[in-house]
Amino acid sequence: MLSVGFNIAINATTQGVPKIIESLFPNLPNFIAHLLATIVLVIVLAKLVYKPYKQMIEKQRQKITEVLSDAIEKQTQANIKIKQANSLLEEAKTESVSIINTARVDAEIQKNKIIDNANLQAKNIQSYAQNSIKQEKIKAQLEIKNTIVNLAINSAEKILSKEIDKNTNKKLIEEFIKDLD
């Protein structure tokens, strides 16, 4: 039974094969002409279009490669310049800190000089004032002494009525004043 069904299927398919082939290839000379024309067209297109297309693609590839290598080179240069700029910036920061520290030290030195100078001037003024006071005190003491001596001489002259001369009287008064000091 199986063989009968299989034979029927084979007969049906073998009868239909020439029809399918006839449907696909209705005219064998036309098919061969079309096939040859297609092959010729593919060869001509390959020669005329593919080679220039391939050359154009290669040129584009070269341009892209050049652009990429140029971009890489420029990126490398930019990175180098960025590093240089960063190092210059660091140097500038270091230098500015150094300048600020130097300025602070100089300002501190200048401040100390000004303070020392002011203290020295104050001491000079104070010692001058003390010397002036001492001189004025000595001068005042001398004036008081002379006034006392003169008063004592005048009083003694009146009291003694001219019995003792002026030099002896003066010596007595000076001894009296020395004893008071």
From Swiss-Prot:
| Compartment(s) | Cell membrane
The answer to whether UniProt assigns keyword Calcium to this entry is: no
Q: Which InterPro entries match?
A: ATP_synth_B-like_membr_sf, ATP_synth_b/b'su_bac/chlpt, ATP_synth_F0_bsu_bac, ATP_synthase_B_chain
Predominantly, its location class is membrane
Its job: F(1)F(0) ATP synthase produces ATP from ADP in the presence of a proton or sodium gradient. F-type ATPases consist of two structural domains, F(1) containing the extramembraneous catalytic core and F(0) containing the membrane proton channel, linked together by a central stalk and a peripheral stalk. During catalysis, ATP synthesis in the catalytic domain of F(1) is coupled via a rotary mechanism of the central stalk subunits to proton translocation. Component of the F(0) channel, it forms part of the peripheral stalk, linking F(1) to F(0).
Molecular function terms from GO: proton-transporting ATP synthase activity, rotational mechanism; proton-transporting ATPase activity, rotational mechanism
Write down the NCBIfam families for this protein, in alphabetical order. Answer: ATP_synt_b (TIGR01144)
The family note in this entry says:
Belongs to the ATPase B chain family.
* Oligomeric and partner information: F-type ATPases have 2 components, F(1) - the catalytic core - and F(0) - the membrane proton channel. F(1) has five subunits: alpha(3), beta(3), gamma(1), delta(1), epsilon(1). F(0) has three main subunits: a(1), b(2) and c(10-14). The alpha and beta chains form an alternating ring which encloses part of the gamma chain. F(1) is attached to F(0) by a central stalk formed by the gamma and epsilon chains, while a peripheral stalk is formed by the delta and b chains.
**Topological category with respect to the lipid bilayer:** Single-pass membrane protein
Keywords of the record: ATP synthesis, Cell membrane, CF(0), Hydrogen ion transport, Ion transport, Membrane, Transmembrane, Transmembrane helix, Transport
Protein name (database record): ATP synthase subunit b
Q: Name one GO cellular component term.
A: plasma membrane
Could you list the residue ranges that cross the membrane?
Answer: 24-44
**Gene behind this protein:** atpF
